[in-house]
Amino acid sequence: MAASDSSSAGSSTESMLQESRRFPPPAEFAKDAHVTSIEQYEQMHRRSVEDPESFWAEVAEGFHWFEPWTKVLDWNLPDAKWFVDGKTNLAYNCLDRQIDAGLGDQTAIVWEAESPGSDGQFVVEHWSYADLHREVCKFANVLKAQGVKKGDVVTIYMGMIPQLAIAMLACARIGAPHSIIFGGFSASAIRDRVEDGQSRIVVTCDGSYRRAKIVPLKDNVDEALTMTDRVDTVIVYERTKHDGVNYIDGRDHKWDALMADASADCDAEQLDSEDLAFILYTSGSTGKPKGIMHTTGGYMVYAAMTAKLTFDLNADDPNEMYWCTADIGWITGHSYIIYGLLPNRVPTLMYEGAPNEPGPDRFWDMVERHQVTKFYTAPTAIRAFMKWGDEHVEKHDLSSLKVLGTVGEPINPEAWVWYHEKIGGSKCPIVDTWWQTETGGHMLTPLPGATTTTPGSCCRPMLGIDAAVVNSDGEEVPNNTGGILVVRKPWPSMLRGIYGDRQRFVETYWEKVPGMYCPADGARVDPDGNFWITGRIDDVIVVAGHNLGTMEIESALVSHPDVAEAAVVGFPHDVKGTGIAAFVITQGQAPSPGSDAAEAMKKSMSAHVAKELGPISKPDQIRLTEALPKTRSGKIMRRLLRDIAAGNPITQDTTTLEDRSIVEKLQASG
Ligand code: WT7
């Protein structure tokens, strides 16, 4: 529910981090971009928020509609209907449109397996629009033959293989909303989602590969299905073909066997613009996961438009090769591996495995071999690459790269600059994209040909997005004053609800600041009009009457030469009310706890923060640690850190932790 430190949510957060570096778009890049200057962006943005209906109508006209809409928007807060009465199909716009235009032979997906083939070369597959279309139609017929009808929720739990894309597009083709579960989740997560989504069918794999080991996906499904009797059908794609996989007669079917007899003719269902396209569960920091609902027309239009603008995609550039390193099990993968990319007719690279398999240079080796032009990853990955060492990057020619993207959490300026210099060769614009599972697509981001970027800022609102930083009464706060980020107008890919929980939808997003969408992030706007995310509003800490964004302190810490990564939380403090606790991963081996070297290092880190941000931001506790408690999606579990910092017993659920042993280590770290 609402922020635990909600006392601070409405008042102003003081922003102390000053960043003066500016990176204008390279002229060479800007001249051919979709949006070529900040003036052009500003003029387009103004028009898009002043007259949204004509703006969105124009964007939506670039897609195939079986029947046109009668009204662009029907808005009854918090319920939006976009492109009312319009009939369309996501899979049709991804595949058939390219084929109809005579371009079916072009590459839609390039897939690379984690392990090499028997010849020692990495296994790469090129899937054209026509190839995908054929398999998608066949699998759509398989689903129908298994009794799946329009509106039935299909659970998908697979590794990062082309068949995952095929399964999701097949669902989209027949109007069966998919509910994709990240392949790193366990049996109980499957059970919860199957139950919540009332899904009777699961599509999975026997196993998937991760760091050359087999993740037993089918075993996990089997275990989940001992805990619910909702599922009567399981379809299994055999990826690993390992021994011991159990098949239950009547319930379990092999993908290949079903596909062998399936027809490749399957008309795309003419779906209503507001038909449910998918459910995707997002954890929220407490309670049971929320099934975020996205619908067909609005999501399609927004995902594809934002992909095109943010990455400046160009279908007519034969060298274009886009790579997003996320897993399709997250919204980033839904929107920016599949649904935003295929309608733009740009090849999307899909990688099966881990970034350090077989070595820490895997990503850079792939960028070089595939001549990747647009690359999209997360700050946590960037910091890992920094820690692994520049030599793994320097081995490779990365000169094909043109735009670099980041998403998922605030990027600290040190990581931003490293990404810019080491990966981008100081020539690639960086797009720091702020958005959420709930928003469906990018909300705040630079446009690479238009925006002068500054490290750590996600810059400007996307076209059509009316974002602002306000106090809890919804009034805009002055520049450089922290407040609550809100979106004041509806946009096409906004969530339509939480599956089965109307009240939670209304309370979570629409009641914190009445009349506005509230994503629960704190932010400020600098005098140039650039947005800075200061962290979740429940991460804001109030120290001696000053409100501080934890992210700013983390950034200051990470700019210390001995710090690789830092997480900052508040803890009860006798004098200040709230003290600042910092959990720090050091560069290289940490000095042993309690040693003079450790104490000296902590002192130097404290002094550094005081120098960067002012003494008020100086941590009261620093704990040197070798790891931070993270969920499998890479988010730091801050509530857990708060309990550790306060010396409280751990009562919360730690089952989503990537490595559970780390809790004891942190408690011992003192
Ligand atoms: C939360 C949403 C959107 C796909 C990945 C995460 C944080 C996301 C940024 C960014 C600062 C960011 C926010 C947001 N976040 N991108 N560029 N800068 N913070 O999706 O799991 O729905 O999480 O991630 O706190 O609310 P998600």
Protein language model regions, located:
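Conserved AMP-binding/adenylate-forming core of the ANL superfamily
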Residues: 91, 109-169, 186-191, 251-257, ...
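Conserved pre-ATP/AMP-binding loop-to-beta segment of ANL
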Residues: 107, 234-236, 247-281, 288, ...
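Conserved AMP-binding A3 loop
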Residues: 122-130, 269-270, 277-301
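Structural core segment of the AMP-binding/adenylate-forming
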Residues: 169, 173-257, 371, 378-379
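AMP-binding/adenylate-forming catalytic core of the ANL superfamily
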Residues: 181-206, 221, 368, 375, ...
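Conserved AMP-binding/adenylation subdomain of ANL enzymes
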Residues: 300-321, 331-373, 387-388
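Gly/Ser/Thr-rich phosphate-binding loop
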Residues: 339, 343, 373-377, 386-453, ...
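Conserved ATP/PPi-binding loop(s) of AMP-dependent carboxylate-activating enzymes
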Residues: 460-464, 475-509, 548-550, 648-650
